[in-house]
Amino acid sequence: MVEATKKAFVTGHPIKHSRSPKIHGHWLAQHGIDGSYEAIDVAPQDFAEFIAALQANGFRGGNVTIPHKEAAFAVAQRRDQAAEEIGAVNTLWFEDGVLRGGNTDGHGFAANLDDCAPGWANTGPAVVLGAGGASRAVIQALKQRGFSDIRIVNRTLARAQELRDRFGAGVSAHGTAATDELLADAGLLVNTTALGMVGNEGLAADPALLPDHAIVTDLVYVPLETPLLAAARARGLKTVDGLGMLLNQAVPGFEHWFGVRPQVTAELRALIVADLVPKP
């Protein structure tokens, strides 16, 4: 009997911008797997119906992105520790007939820094700019790696305070007026906001205020070098762009669906970098 094609998906609304099919398609071809990974646009009101039909439609699981991560958290019958701590699911898979949910964003964040800035977890206090969903994943990863002084900076202080209360000891909340003071002894600066994206240029913090040993990373990857990273590089600081987080967060899901743990390679990165360049 010929085994059916292994199927996975990424769903969001909208979803046509997703680079995930290119990432997983590269790995499927590399490993010679008879599989598929498709982008499916699902409106919020149709999400529950979409999930209910996954097995009937032959899917082993898939990725979930904005705006469905909280809905995926609710529908998963079992959730991993990261998903519980973050309160959102970005990866779904079936195991013994049970729909399981995980969150690989924190893994992607930490693995990117492991690859590009070895020793990053021993640099001192971390300043996290922003208090949205991405910030939750970053804080979860930082706590897992042993950070005991995590400073959330957000324009709306109440949002930062919510995350402080969620993650507890070692996490503090601050308004943007405190940014300069917080940077003075920080070893890691993380931008989780949209500031720096194409069309939303600007600096959320001044890297010139950081110590010489500090590392600066930006979750934005379009452009690859944001104004924040450019300023940090000009200051002589170690910088890490956000593309590696996207690539590394995809690894656990691929293993769940297709049975092989793929590698994030220079070849894969080059493939996605080429796709980031605007088409004429």
UniProtKB/Swiss-Prot annotation:
UniProt-annotated catalytic positions: 69
User: EC number(s)?
Assistant: 1.1.1.25
Iron recorded as keyword: no
Pathway it works in: Metabolic intermediate biosynthesis; chorismate biosynthesis; chorismate from D-erythrose 4-phosphate and phosphoenolpyruvate: step 4/7
User: For shikimate, which residues are the binding ones?
Assistant: 18-20, 65, 90, 105, 221
Q: Which domain of life is it from?
A: Bacteria
* Cited SUPFAM superfamilies: Aminoacid dehydrogenase-like, N-terminal domain (SSF53223), NAD(P)-binding Rossmann-fold domains (SSF51735)
Q: Kindly give the InterPro entries that the UniProt entry links to this protein.
A: Aminoacid_DH-like_N_sf, NAD(P)-bd_dom_sf, SDH_C, Shikimate_DH, Shikimate_DH-bd_N, Shikimate_DH_fam, Shikm_DH/Glu-tRNA_Rdtase
> Where along the chain is NADP(+) bound?
130-134, 154-159, 219, 242
Specify whether Metal-binding is a keyword of the entry.
no
Record's GO cellular component terms: cytosol
Q: What class of enzyme is it?
A: oxidoreductase
Which reaction equations make up its catalytic activity?
shikimate + NADP(+) = 3-dehydroshikimate + NADPH + H(+)
Keywords attached to this entry: Amino-acid biosynthesis, Aromatic amino acid biosynthesis, NADP, Oxidoreductase
GO biological process terms held by the UniProt record: amino acid biosynthetic process; aromatic amino acid family biosynthetic process; chorismate biosynthetic process; shikimate metabolic process
Functional summary from the UniProt entry: Involved in the biosynthesis of the chorismate, which leads to the biosynthesis of aromatic amino acids. Catalyzes the reversible NADPH linked reduction of 3-dehydroshikimate (DHSA) to yield shikimate (SA).
Assembly and partners?
Homodimer.
The UniProt entry's sequence similarity note says:
Belongs to the shikimate dehydrogenase family.
Q: Report the protein name in the record.
A: Shikimate dehydrogenase (NADP(+))
